[in-house]
């Protein structure tokens, strides 16, 4: 992870006048049926039994080292809202995942975070669910948190992440297309939400977890931005899954290869960022 962070930091410096990168340091992995590796917070050493106490320490240490040793800011998924207090002083960007976006606690906690919170559409693809979550996060809330009654002022930086969907037949339905983007922008306008901002998640159900498809998705989205001024103004980022080696593996045997979702390797990542930079510089 730190080797990847060092490379990303060097690349960030090359493109800093057009691109701002936040490194995904995802430490908890949601599981559809509860099985499988659940991330650093659960199992900091994959050769040993799960240990949440050691995992929480490892999470803080990893975020801290990435930030202090590379100068990058970090992002993490807020899978467990109760853990926010353990990383709130370190993490600069929080994501609410597809399986959590409809949950009231996630929405209300997001309303009290003083950092951007990206909210993904649910796996069904229902944009209304996601926008209701953003509305809740952008407004004042009163609720119980860590055994205390808390009030929030709302988070004006809560925004959209489009990650694709799965239909009732189990087939992927991408939602980074031109018409979907315009639909999302119209919903932003109709609901009067602040700071309209859309991130495209280039993996997951947009790519069908075919990690090389991320390159095509980025290219098509950049074209859509060129064709429509509203899209250009609102679609302002990508969430790209990348690591040192292409693909994924079941066990940590190959250095720098993901043991969760398949990722772009470093060479492809660097080339893609440079391509984005060149497109934005035209």
Describe every region a protein language model picked out.
Residues 2-187, 204-220, 224-237, 242-252, ...:
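Active-site-facing alpha/beta catalytic cores
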Residues 194-197:
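Short, structured loop/turn "capping" segments at alpha-beta junctions
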Residues 250-263:
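Acidic, Ser/Thr-rich peripheral helices and adjacent loops at domain boundaries
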Residues 200, 265:
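Conserved, mostly hydrophobic/aromatic
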């Amino acid at each position: 992870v730190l080797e990847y962070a060092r490379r990303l930091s060097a690349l960030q410096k090359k493109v800093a006048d057009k691109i701002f990168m936040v490194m995904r340091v995802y430490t908890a992995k949601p599981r559809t049926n509860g099985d499988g590796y659940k991330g650093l917070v659960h199992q900091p050493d994959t050769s040993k039994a799960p240990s949440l106490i050691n995992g929480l320490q490892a999470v803080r240490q990893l975020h801290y080292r990435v930030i202090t040793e590379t100068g990058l800011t970090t992002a993490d998924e807020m899978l467990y809202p109760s853990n926010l207090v353990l990383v709130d002083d370190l993490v600069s960007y929080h994501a609410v995942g597809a399986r959590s976006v409809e949950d009231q606690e996630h929405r209300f906690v997001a309303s009290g975070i003083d950092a951007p919170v990206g909210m993904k559409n649910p796996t069904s693809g229902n944009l209304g669910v996601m926008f209701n979550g953003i509305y809740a996060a952008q407004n004042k809330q009163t609720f119980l948190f860590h055994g205390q009654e808390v009030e929030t002022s709302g988070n004006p930086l809560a925004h959209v992440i489009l990650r694709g969907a799965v239909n009732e037949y189990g087939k992927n339905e991408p939602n980074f297309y031109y018409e979907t983007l315009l639909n999302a922008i119209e919903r932003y306008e109709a609901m009067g939400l602040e700071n309209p901002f859309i991130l495209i998640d280039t993996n997951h159900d947009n790519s069908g977890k075919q990690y090389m498809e991320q390159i095509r998705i980025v290219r098509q989205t950049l074209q859509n931005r060129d064709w429509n001024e509203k899209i250009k103004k609102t679609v302002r980022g990508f969430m790209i899954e990348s690591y040192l080696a292409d693909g994924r593996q079941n066990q940590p045997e190959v250095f720098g290869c993901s043991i969760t979702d398949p990722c772009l390797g470093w060479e492809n990542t660097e080339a893609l960022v440079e391509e984005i930079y060149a497109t934005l510089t035209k």
